[in-house]
């Protein structure tokens, strides 16, 4: 079933859009200004890596406080660089979830305040929709519908993207997300934070076939993901003392790639079996920045006579441009929200999707 995310208020379709986007759902504070044609007028980001590195992961309280300190200066920086003032902006788009609720609230309340003070429309953006629509920012020829592999630190899903606000979830993780498994593997191997890039770098010098690691759910008929068992296998391989660190990293990364390809293959066959025509196979989310993942998915797409569309790495990880662009997409369709819109820790793109069998299914 295709389920639309309902707007709280519908306005007349505007001819043009210049949207300010605010992102604060995890550990990146980001602001950007994007126009109707997808031109990124200005985009700036303040990372919190140094703040969280001593803890080996993101600390929600620290993240929220950092967003408070950094968001307003970033807004001023983007406006100054663009030569625009708030009166010239058509709408304010802010992440309203899902994510770490403290950080989400900081950004969304700031968006509401700007909307109220400047009398500009507010657009509440689902962070996942920001990722889902970013490929259309990166490739202006991409049209609906397309199949999306959304891979990040908090989510691992396969979605049929039919239109703005219309999503059908075909697969999700039944436990850990792929990016979370990368972070945990980096911690096990002592590679530091953030874990994804650290594992990717370490894997460059390793043998991807050196360590026998499982491919969870590889024989399952449904295209759902599972990475908890793989993470445990990495821990055991490391504790055995038999394998070199770079070989474990390379073998882990290859196992993840094999799972992504296998699950995506099943999803592609599923929609082909339903005679659904799509225009592209698309990847997005922080893990999509991993350069080792792309070649295998390119081969898969080509085997199904589809192009693989992947944003540049700078648009894969959390950024303000993706939120501003999602705001542009919604604003052009008249999808406007009001000041009573809530911030949400969880906000599935397809709230009516059947729950996958397994514990801890993520939105």
Curated annotation (Swiss-Prot):
GO terms for biological process: tRNA threonylcarbamoyladenosine modification. Keywords: Acyltransferase, Cytoplasm, Iron, Metal-binding, Transferase, tRNA processing. One of its GO terms (cellular component) is cytoplasm. Its main location: cytoplasm. It is an enzyme of class 2 (transferase). Substrate binds at residues 150-154, 183, 196, 290. It is found in: Cytoplasm. GO terms for molecular function: iron ion binding; N(6)-L-threonylcarbamoyladenine synthase activity. It catalyses: L-threonylcarbamoyladenylate + adenosine(37) in tRNA = N(6)-L-threonylcarbamoyladenosine(37) in tRNA + AMP + H(+). It holds the Pfam family TsaD. Gene3D superfamilies: 3.30.420.40. Its cofactor is Fe(2+). Coiled coil: none annotated. Fe cation binds at residues 127, 131, 318. InterPro entries: ATPase_NBD, Gcp-like_dom, KAE1/TsaD, TsaD. Belongs to the KAE1 / TsaD family. NCBIfam families: gcp_kae1, T6A_TsaD_YgjD. This is tRNA N6-adenosine threonylcarbamoyltransferase. It comes from Zymomonas mobilis subsp. mobilis (strain ATCC 31821 / ZM4 / CP4). The lineage of its organism: Bacteria, Pseudomonadati, Pseudomonadota, Alphaproteobacteria, Sphingomonadales.
């Amino acid at each position: 079933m295709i389920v639309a995310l309902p707007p709280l208020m519908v306005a007349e379709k505007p001819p043009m859009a210049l949207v300010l986007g605010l992102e604060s759902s995890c550990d990146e504070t980001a602001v950007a200004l994007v126009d109707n044609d997808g031109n990124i007028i200005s985009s700036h980001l303040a990372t919190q890596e140094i703040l969280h590195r001593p803890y080996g992961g993101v600390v929600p309280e620290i993240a929220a406080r950092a967003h408070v300190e950094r968001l307003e200066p970033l807004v001023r920086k983007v406006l100054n660089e663009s030569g625009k003032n708030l009166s010239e902006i058509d709408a304010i788009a802010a992440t309203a979830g899902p994510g770490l609720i403290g950080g989400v609230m900081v950004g969304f309340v700031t968006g509401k305040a700007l909307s109220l003070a400047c009398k500009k429309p507010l657009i509440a953006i689902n962070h996942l929709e920001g990722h889902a629509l970013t490929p259309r920012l990166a490739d202006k020829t991409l049209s609906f519908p397309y199949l999306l592999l959304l891979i990040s630190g908090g989510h691992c899903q396969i979605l049929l993207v039919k239109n703005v606000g219309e999503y059908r979830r075909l697969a999700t993780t039944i436990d850990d997300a792929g990016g979370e498994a990368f972070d945990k593997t980096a911690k096990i191997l002592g590679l530091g934070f953030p874990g994804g890039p650290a594992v990717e770098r370490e894997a460059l010098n390793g043998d991807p076939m050196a360590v026998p690691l499982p491919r969870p759910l590889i024989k399952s008929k449904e295209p759902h993901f599972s990475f908890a068992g793989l993470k445990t296998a990495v821990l055991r391989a490391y504790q055995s003392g038999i394998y070199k660190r770079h070989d474990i990293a390379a073998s882990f990364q290859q196992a993840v790639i094999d799972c992504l390809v296998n699950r995506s293959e099943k999803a592609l066959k599923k929609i082909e079996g339903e005679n659904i025509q799509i225009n592209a196979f698309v990847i997005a989310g922080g893990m999509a920045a991993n350069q080792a993942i792309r070649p295998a998915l390119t081969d898969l797409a080509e085997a199904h006579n589809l192009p693989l569309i992947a944003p540049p790495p700078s648009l894969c990880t959390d950024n303000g441009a993706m939120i501003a662009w999602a705001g542009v997409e919604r604003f052009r369709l008249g999808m406007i929200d009001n000041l009573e819109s809530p911030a949400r820790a969880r906000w599935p793109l397809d709230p009516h999707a059947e729950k996958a069998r397994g514990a801890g299914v993520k939105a």
